[in-house]
């Protein structure tokens, strides 16, 4: 496991002080985070981190996630923040929880720290951000790009619903192709719809 790191702030107000509570409101329970996101239709920001040994992870938390700028953005966009930690210090995390985090790491193909997955409440990711940035503003630009992917995916799927047959199939394929190829297999429902309209698997999505 390698760690990704781009090495190297804010106007303080009562509002930002209140928003900054987001920095201490990270969930650490996978199921609770997804349940909360699912109920509210909110996106999940899942941070795969080595909080006590990974320099890039420590930098990302201190210089990006614990800033007013990020806290405001996370609150405005109603993120459910989820920390999936891989500590090395003995006794910092129950072995069964660490084992579950390792299972999630394999499931989502996480190969470096820090890695952030943006996903829906059903666990389907729509974007991945690997490493840190020098400033919060640079990181927020990455989150904006991820949010645009999410919006485009939802809009393209919605546009397919009134269609039928080949037209619907092509629109659903277009929707799936909004995502990076490595994240497409997690869209189980969308792939099932495509497969039902494409029994000969001409588009090859049944194999995903």
Which positions does each model-derived feature cover?
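Bacterial N-terminal signal peptides
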Residues: 8-17
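Non-globular targeting/processing and membrane-anchoring segments
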Residues: 141-208
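Thiol-based oxidoreductase modules, predominantly thioredoxin-like and allied folds used
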Residues: 24-28, 49-50, 63-99
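Boundary at the C-terminal end of the N-terminal hydrophobic targeting segment
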Residues: 20-22
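Non-catalytic, surface beta->alpha helical segment in thiol-disulfide oxidoreductase systems
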Residues: 63-65, 103-151
């Amino acid at each position: 496991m390698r760690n990704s790191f781009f090495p190297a702030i804010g106007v303080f107000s009562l509002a930002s002080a209140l928003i900054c509570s987001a920095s201490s409101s990270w969930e650490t329970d996978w199921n609770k985070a997804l349940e909360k996101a699912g109920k509210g239709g909110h996106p999940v920001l899942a941070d795969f981190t080595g909080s006590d040994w990974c320099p890039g992870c420590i930098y990302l938390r201190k210089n990006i996630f614990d800033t007013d700028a990020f806290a405001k953005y996370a609150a405005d966009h109603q993120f459910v923040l989820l920390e999936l930690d891989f500590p090395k210090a003995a006794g910092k995390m129950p072995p069964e929880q660490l084992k579950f985090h390792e299972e999630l790491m394999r499931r989502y193909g996480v190969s470096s720290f820090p890695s952030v997955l943006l996903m829906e409440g059903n666990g389907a990711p729509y974007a991945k951000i690997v490493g840190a940035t020098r400033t919060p503003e640079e990181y927020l630009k990455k989150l904006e790009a991820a949010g645009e992917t999410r919006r485009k995916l939802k809009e393209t799927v919605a546009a397919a619903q009134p269609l039928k047959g080949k037209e619907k199939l092509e629109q659903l394929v277009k929707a799936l192709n909004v995502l990076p190829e490595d994240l497409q297999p997690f869209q189980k429902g969308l792939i099932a719809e495509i497969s039902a309209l494409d029994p000969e698997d001409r588009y090859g999505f049944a194999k995903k």
